[in-house]
Amino acid sequence: TQVSGDFKQVGSDAFQKLGGYIFGQNVTDEKIAMTAPVTQTQSPDGSYLVSFFMPSKHSLDTLPNPTDAAVTMVEMPETYFAVTRYRGGWSQEKYLDNEQRLTDAIDAMPEWEVAGEPIWARYDPPIMPSFFRTNEVLIPVRQTRP
């Protein structure tokens, strides 16, 4: 779902919509298991795309349609990612520090280039103490030469 707002707040705002879908606010009232990670990507217009991943037993054909028009479903194409994992809270500063480290690492490898917007992946619920939380920055990449 696409959400406008600040870095920290959009995850909570989007969870209301996405959580509603998996908790049964869909055309069949079906409850769907929560999976991880929850991802957040800033779009060029400044809004954020916040996403849940559906359990592997489902496909776009077997998932119930959402009742909230703000919830959309897409199948992700196969993509290569450069990834860095870190522990800690969900501050924008911590995310940006890790994003920069990963971007620098990609820039240092001439055989790879950035192929899309960075993605923030969160694996733990908000009730998890921040020092136990697992987070990742994923950056889509492609080879510059075969």
Segments predicted by a language model, with ranges:
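A solvent-exposed interaction/effector surface
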Residues: T1-P146
